[in-house]
């Protein structure tokens, strides 16, 4: 039975050494050991190593006299405190991260000479940072936004950073427009509102004037923008990259991360409530999953396009606002990534980690995607100001496990004591070291792909980038009816927040009407605007009418209800046998049942024993759970039926389409009818049906009935 920790720790918990994930290690984690610090059993000292006798009082002239400037202990402490904060990331400021490893499924030497993709026995350390885009460090986790999905591979050949998102496209095609887009989506400059959202005039003014954003905005208005968990979202490299094998043969590829937990989202009402009830909902979910041993896992795959097939599609592979539909080019699995250890210190690891798309290794190379080309500059440039200079690669979390010797010297925060007299190349003084490494099939120096280029310098967008609506239409028409309704409601909500009617009308008439007239008409009706009769441009036909891979409904996952949080509501008089039976049944499926009571105090079961609860129903409301069960016990269910808090908990769970196990009397009292996910018993048959309903994430068939519930 779950219980709270009540004893004070005998050892320091600063490093979290008591949790199972701390036993997991790899080459990168071992290298970080040099920099870890645990103060257990140590004297309090100044930064200069002087022991401190009194850390409670500043040095004064008499007990009530003036403080003295000579108090070097106070001055050091206050000065350091005054400078603890560093500039936050311009975008993706709000984030969290974890350590883990990548393991290739086999030898992919036919595709690339990158060493970490050639040995199935090789464990490559990784560090992953997930983030939102718009909001500052203190913004909410559950806002409607793109999620960053950045992975740093610490390979034997150097660091490889795959800096992607949970959506496979972006808002713009050329990096020169990135400052304009970010200025538009960020809080408006006159009042710094809104925080963490795009439902405001400047964003919709920009995207309604920039049709290339139409496809990405469709993704942002879908359920993909409000993931249930960071563990339950896909990741994408966004751009087309090249993989090159030892023979110099290149292939175009798109990178994909497929979560074993499936692709699942919050409901919009849940997302808004969670932003207030638990701002840290998603980072807490990731932390607790790893701490409990429910290690998140993704499969890395690539869509492979031979160079000879570059132009066989009705879109341009270099256009970052386009996908390659998986029905045209299936995803080839390469390996798996497992996140199995939480950071020891958030600032040192998550805040100071520096990703850059330009961090690649032999066997991987860029393409001429104009957004990617700008990112190659921007990421390094921003780290220099954010992390205090060009030596940010020496920060422990950023250091490669591969050795790095070169002639880059000095600058702010230099940590390396370089030996020798020659800091240039070639030299004869230090034996010519360090020396270049010729390119080779294995363990060679990096060699850029020898792409032939014959062109005039010109500021012009390729005509092949000109179709802005066919893939947005493909996305919408690939959604289930439920997902389509969520998109309609999202557009209506966001545009309903826009103050200027001409912006709302322009988005409906010049963007949505070119995607789908039914979509445009539905949004127009919700905004009180006339429905457009036709689009404003001739939209190209797509090679596909639908792409089933785009619908989340087709990505249920492969781990059942492992790691899913189930609320078990109890009050005094609960049947102990029923509780025990339900807990054991859920734990058998590796779910995480949690006992919740009217308060945080233990409840008395029918056998006379005190049952400890993990939280109160007020402290952990229904929006934090994937399912709800109520054990039998008349006194307990009567108490819940009489509690406004419990009734709200249950009605809200029903409204949010959660799977539920209730007594018949309790359901009748709440006015709820049995359905595929509302079971009116606690026997094994009901538990089995409950598990199946939780696997489906929501009881979608209930959505129409749930609209009438006022929770």
Curated annotation (Swiss-Prot):
Location, primary (coarse class): cytoplasm
Gene Ontology annotations for the cellular component aspect, listed alphabetically: cytosol
Key words, A-Z: Cytoplasm, Heme, Hydrogen peroxide, Iron, Metal-binding, Oxidoreductase, Peroxidase
GO molecular function: catalase activity; heme binding; metal ion binding
One Gene Ontology term from the biological process aspect of the record: hydrogen peroxide catabolic process
Biased composition (Basic and acidic residues): 1-10
Pfam families with a match to the protein in the record: Catalase, Catalase-rel, Catalase_C
Coiled-coil residues: none
InterPro entries in alphabetical order: Catalase, Catalase_AS, Catalase_clade2, Catalase_clade2_helical, Catalase_core, Catalase_haem_BS, Catalase_immune_responsive, Catalase_large_C
Domain of life: Bacteria
Binding residue positions for heme: 379
EC top class named in words: oxidoreductase
Ranges of Polar residues composition bias in the record: 14-27
Catalytic activity: 2 H2O2 = O2 + 2 H2O
Gene3D superfamilies: 1.20.1370.20, 3.40.50.880, Catalase core domain (2.40.180.10)
Region (Disordered): 1-27
Cytoplasm listed as a keyword: yes
Active site (UniProt): 92, 165
E.C. number(s) listed in UniProt: 1.11.1.6
Localization per Swiss-Prot or TrEMBL: Cytoplasm
Function: Decomposes hydrogen peroxide into water and oxygen; serves to protect cells from the toxic effects of hydrogen peroxide.
Family listed: Belongs to the catalase family. HPII subfamily.
Protein name: Catalase HPII
Originating organism: Pseudomonas putida
């Amino acid at each position: 039975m779950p219980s709270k920790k009540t004893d004070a720790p005998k050892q320091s918990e600063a490093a979290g050494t008591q949790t199972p994930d701390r036993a997991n290690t790899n080459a990168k984690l071992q290298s970080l050991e040099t920099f870890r610090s645990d103060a257990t059993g140590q004297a309090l000292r100044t930064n200069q190593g002087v022991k401190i006798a009194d850390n409670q009082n500043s040095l004064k002239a008499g007990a009530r006299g003036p403080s003295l400037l000579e108090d070097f202990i106070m001055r050091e402490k206050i000065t350091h405190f005054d400078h603890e904060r560093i500039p936050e990331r311009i975008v993706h400021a709000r984030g969290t991260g974890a350590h883990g490893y990548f393991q290739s499924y086999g030898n992919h030497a036919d595709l690339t000479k990158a060493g970490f993709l050639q040995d199935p026995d090789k464990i490559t350390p990784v560090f992953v940072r997930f983030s939102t885009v718009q909001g500052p460090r203190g913004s909410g986790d559950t806002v409607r936004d793109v999620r960053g999905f950045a992975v740093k591979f610490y390979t034997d050949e150097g660091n490889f950073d795959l800096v992607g998102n949970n959506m496979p496209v972006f808002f713009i095609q050329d990096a020169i427009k990135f400052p304009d887009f970010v200025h538009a989506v960020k809080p408006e400059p006159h009042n710094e509102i809104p925080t963490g959202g795009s439902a405001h005039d400047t964003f919709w003014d920009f995207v309604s004037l920039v049709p290339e954003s139409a496809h990405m905005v469709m993704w942002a208005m879908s359920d993909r923008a409000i993931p249930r968990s960071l563990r339950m979202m896909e990741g994408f490299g966004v751009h087309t990259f090249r993989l090159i094998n030892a023979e110099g043969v290149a292939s175009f590829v798109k990178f994909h991360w497929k979560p074993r937990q499936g692709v699942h989202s919050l409901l919009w009402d849940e997302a808004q409530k969670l932003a207030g009830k638990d701002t840290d909902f998603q980072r807490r979910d990731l932390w607790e999953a790893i701490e409990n041993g429910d290690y998140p896992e993704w499969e890395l795959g690539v869509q492979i396009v031979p160079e000879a097939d570059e132009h066989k599609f009705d879109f341009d592979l270099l256009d970052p606002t386009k996908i390659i539909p998986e029905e045209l080019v299936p995803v080839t699995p390469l390996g798996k990534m497992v996140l199995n250890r939480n950071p020891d210190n958030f600032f040192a690891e998550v805040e100071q980690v520096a990703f850059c798309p330009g961090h690649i290794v032999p066997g991987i190379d860029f393409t001429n995607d104009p957004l990617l080309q700008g990112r190659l500059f921007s990421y390094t440039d921003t780290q220099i100001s954010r992390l205090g200079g060009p030596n940010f690669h020496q920060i422990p979390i950023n250091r490669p496990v591969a050795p790095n010797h070169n002639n880059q010297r000095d600058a702010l925060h230099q940590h390396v004591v370089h030996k020798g007299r020659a800091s240039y190349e070639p030299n004869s003084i230090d034996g010519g070291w360090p020396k270049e490494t010729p390119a080779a099939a294995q363990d060679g120096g990096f060699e850029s792909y020898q792409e032939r280029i014959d062109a005039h310098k010109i500021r012009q967008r390729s005509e092949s980038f000109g179709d802005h609506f066919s893939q947005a239409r493909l996305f919408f028409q690939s959604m289930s009816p439920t997902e389509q309704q969520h998109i309609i409601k999202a557009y209506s909500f966001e545009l309903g927040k826009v103050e200027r009617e001409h912006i709302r009308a322009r988005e409906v008439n010049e963007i949505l009407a070119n995607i789908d007239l039914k979509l445009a008409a539905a949004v127009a009706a919700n905004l009180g605007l006339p429905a457009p009769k036709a689009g404003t441009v001739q939209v190209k036909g797509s090679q596909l009418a639908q792409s089933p891979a785009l619908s989340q409904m087709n990505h249920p996952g492969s781990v059942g209800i492992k790691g899913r949080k189930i609320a078990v509501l109890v009050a005094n008089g609960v049947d102990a046998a029923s509780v025990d039976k339900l807990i054991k049944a859920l734990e058998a499926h590796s779910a995480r049942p949690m006992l919740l009571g009217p308060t945080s105090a233990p409840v008395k079961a029918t056998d006379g024993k005190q049952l400890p609860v993990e939280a109160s129903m007020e402290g952990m409301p229904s929006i934090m759970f994937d399912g709800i069960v109520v054990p039998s016990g008349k006194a307990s269910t009567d108490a819940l039926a009489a509690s406004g808090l419990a009734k709200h908990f249950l009605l809200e769970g029903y409204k949010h389409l959660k799977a539920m196990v209730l007594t018949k009397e309790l359901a009748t009292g709440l006015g709820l009818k049995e359905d595929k996910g509302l079971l009116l018993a606690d026997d094994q048959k009901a538990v089995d049906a409950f598990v199946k309903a939780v696997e489906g994430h929501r009881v979608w068939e209930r959505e129409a009935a749930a609209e009438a519930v006022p929770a």
